[in-house]
From Swiss-Prot:
<protein>
    <recommendedName>
        <fullName>2-succinyl-5-enolpyruvyl-6-hydroxy-3-cyclohexene-1-carboxylate synthase</fullName>
        <ecNumber>2.2.1.9</ecNumber>
    </recommendedName>
</protein>
<keyword id="KW-0479">Metal-binding</keyword>
<dbReference type="InterPro" id="IPR032264">
    <property type="entry name" value="MenD_middle"/>
</dbReference>
<keyword id="KW-0808">Transferase</keyword>
<dbReference type="Pfam" id="PF16582">
    <property type="entry name" value="TPP_enzyme_M_2"/>
</dbReference>
<dbReference type="GO" id="GO:0009234">
    <property type="term" value="P:menaquinone biosynthetic process"/>
</dbReference>
<keyword id="KW-0786">Thiamine pyrophosphate</keyword>
<dbReference type="InterPro" id="IPR029061">
    <property type="entry name" value="THDP-binding"/>
</dbReference>
<comment type="function">
    <text>Catalyzes the thiamine diphosphate-dependent decarboxylation of 2-oxoglutarate and the subsequent addition of the resulting succinic semialdehyde-thiamine pyrophosphate anion to isochorismate to yield 2-succinyl-5-enolpyruvyl-6-hydroxy-3-cyclohexene-1-carboxylate (SEPHCHC).</text>
</comment>
<dbReference type="GO" id="GO:0000287">
    <property type="term" value="F:magnesium ion binding"/>
</dbReference>
<dbReference type="InterPro" id="IPR029035">
    <property type="entry name" value="DHS-like_NAD/FAD-binding_dom"/>
</dbReference>
<dbReference type="GO" id="GO:0070204">
    <property type="term" value="F:2-succinyl-5-enolpyruvyl-6-hydroxy-3-cyclohexene-1-carboxylic-acid synthase activity"/>
</dbReference>
<dbReference type="InterPro" id="IPR004433">
    <property type="entry name" value="MenaQ_synth_MenD"/>
</dbReference>
<comment type="pathway">
    <text>Quinol/quinone metabolism; menaquinone biosynthesis.</text>
</comment>
<dbReference type="GO" id="GO:0030976">
    <property type="term" value="F:thiamine pyrophosphate binding"/>
</dbReference>
<dbReference type="GO" id="GO:0030145">
    <property type="term" value="F:manganese ion binding"/>
</dbReference>
<keyword id="KW-0460">Magnesium</keyword>
């Protein structure tokens, strides 16, 4: 069998093995060395191929697909710096748990470290960030197909979160048509080809049914606080209902999808009455990590309950404050089922009153002003029916967290693992494609500029998509930090003075630039009636959002 045919056959077996582990989407960037993988993916009847010319955006497209589907998503790139461009998405997946399969084509070993073109040291180049790595040999019929598929099966069985990096060297020639002349190597897998299960069904360690904490019957009768970070929509809804049934205050992050029963917590947590009441908590039960609000993080770090339990399906330490307590690795819904609530009246009803007064203060303060603070506060009014929301990083996510209140169980996505602004537009595209739902996204101008190539992916949406770019002319998150005033604009804010009308035109997207709330709601409503993507630019005064937040913090503290 020629090298052409065997490269293709090797790649076909590899991809078939991945489909046995739930891989249905594959994201492909152009490249020559990756031709065997690309052609195998293109011809596979159960793989849906997505393409993008920018590998960094491609990785984030896969990240978005994995967020929504809950299934592993494969990525195919050529050798060299194309591989390095996957690093940001890989890091994010490692922190937030999405499973990515990075298939990186490589030069064969004899072309490494000898001056050959587009040949870099790719083995283990991602250091400790992948959950699993697999460095394949150069394809050869001397290695059995059973070895290849069982290697894939074993790596996938261990991949409960994060990325698997599979480095795939291919020697020339890379091009040519396959034929059925020599099938002995792959045919040795026999009836495996007609099935849908892995060759090697390697089980994870048996843990048995989830058992309740032995002292839960005691602690559920005490004064507790429920803290909900980044969890999925159903987990957030159930955790909030569980906490309210217990009579415990529920503090929900913007990504908790809990409905935030005590809204605007990041505004009222510094209030003297809130501090006095919450200091009486005997136990804090936290679901999910990655808290957003500064004041919430400060309270979480400073609180000293008798017990602190943190429940998250991801392993590892997820508490930067390093509380003494219990780190419980478990699915949230299963844990809730094993720990039923004992109904009780709220032990701190004053917090609900304080939260209501804070929300009323926000409404009265922002009612007459149009800007990013008002949009963050009223964002729930713009959400599509039976749709989903993606929130960017930096200032906007903090404003939505502090000023808004999103519906319980409404899907909210974000890249809050490493909290970078790279790849957000591409992630939005992946989230939309993965669900097929109408999608509202909101992000800042520098975030949009950073991933401007991602707008190309938004030309191919499957449901109405509205992307709101808050153009406050720079990284205004830094206006909230003690950055040196004389150097702030040049070295931190970096205003770009851009008009996103031209970006929308470049990628043939609908565009609007509303100047008040009525015009914004009209533009968003029109977006839901279109089948494509609408880019809405909000041109707002640079520091107005940060100043509004600071003003409201002062007002709520004085309530």
């Amino acid at each position: 069998m020629s090298s052409i045919l065997f490269n293709r056959r090797w790649a076909s077996v590899l991809l078939e093995a991945l489909t046995r582990h739930g891989v249905h989407h594959v994201c492909i960037a152009p490249g020559s060395r990756s031709t065997p993988l690309t052609m195998a993916a293109a011809s596979h009847p159960r793989l849906h191929s997505h393409t993008h010319f920018d590998e960094r955006g491609l990785g984030h497209l896969a990240l978005g697909l994995a967020k929504v589907s809950g299934q592993p998503v494969a990525v195919i790139v050529t050798s060299g710096t194309a591989v390095a461009n996957l690093y940001p998405a890989l890091i994010e997946a490692g922190l937030t748990g999405e499973r990515l399969i990075l298939l990186t084509a490589d030069r064969p070993p004899e072309l490494i470290d000898c001056g050959a073109n587009q040949a870099i040291r790719q083995q283990n180049m991602f250091a400790s960030h992948p959950t699993e790595t697999l460095s394949l040999p150069r394809p050869t019929p001397d290695i059995s197909a059973a070895w290849l598929v069982s290697s894939i099966d074993s790596a996938m069985a261990r991949l409960d979160h994060g990325a698997l990096h599979i480095n795939c060297p291919f020697a020339d020639p890379l091009y040519g048509e396959d034929d059925d002349g020599q099938q002995g190597w792959s045919a040795a897998l026999g009836c495996w080809w007609q099935g849908e299960t892995p060759w090697l069904q390697e089980s994870s360690p048996y843990t048995g049914a989830l058992r309740a904490e032995v002292d839960w019957a005691q602690w559920r009768r005490r004064r507790g606080v429920v803290l909900i970070g980044r969890v999925d929509a159903e987990a957030g809804r159930q955790a909030a209902a569980w906490g309210e049934e217990l009579g415990w205050p529920v503090l929900g992050d913007v990504l908790s999808q809990s409905g935030q029963p005590l809204p605007c917590a990041d505004l009222w947590l510094p209030h003297a009455e809130a501090r006095r009441l919450l200091a009486q908590a005997e136990i804090v039960v936290q679901f999910g990590a990655s808290l957003t609000g500064k004041r919430l993080l400060q309270w979480q770090a400073a609180c000293k309950p008798q017990r602190y339990w943190l429940i998250d399906p991801l392993p590892g330490r997820l508490d930067p404050a390093c509380h003494r307590g219990r780190r419980l690795v478990a699915p949230v819904q299963a844990w809730l089922q094993a720990h039923p609530a004992q109904p009780a009246a709220p032990w701190a009803p004053q917090l609900k009153v304080l939260a209501g007064r804070a929300a009323q203060c926000v409404e009265q303060t922002l009612q007459a002003s149009f800007g990013e603070a008002q949009v963050a506060h009223r964002l729930a009014q713009l959400l599509p029916l039976r749709g989903q929301l993606f929130v960017g990083n930096s200032l906007i996510v903090r404003l939505v967290d502090a000023l808004g209140q999103l519906p319980a169980g409404y899907p909210v996505y974000s890249n809050r693992g490493a909290s970078g602004i790279d790849g957000l537009v591409s992630t939005i595209a992946g989230v939309q494609r993965g669900s097929g739902l109408p999608t509202l996204a909101i992000l800042g101008d520098l975030s949009a500029l950073y991933d401007i190539n991602g707008l190309a992916l938004l030309r191919q949406v499957t449901a109405p998509t509205v992307v709101i770019v808050v153009n406050n002319n720079g990284g205004q998150i830094f206006s909230m930090l003690p950055t040196p005033p004389a150097e702030r604009e040049r070295f931190y804010l970096m205003p770009q003075n851009v008009d996103f009308r031209h970006a929308a035109a470049l990628f043939d997207l609908d565009y609007a630039c509303p100047v008040d709330w009525a015009a914004l709601t009209d533009a968003v409503s029109q977006g839901w009636r279109r089948c494509g993507t609408t880019l809405i630019e909000l041109r707002v005064p640079g520091t107005a959002g940060a100043e509004a937040l600071q003003q409201l913090l002062g007002k709520v503290a004085a309530l």
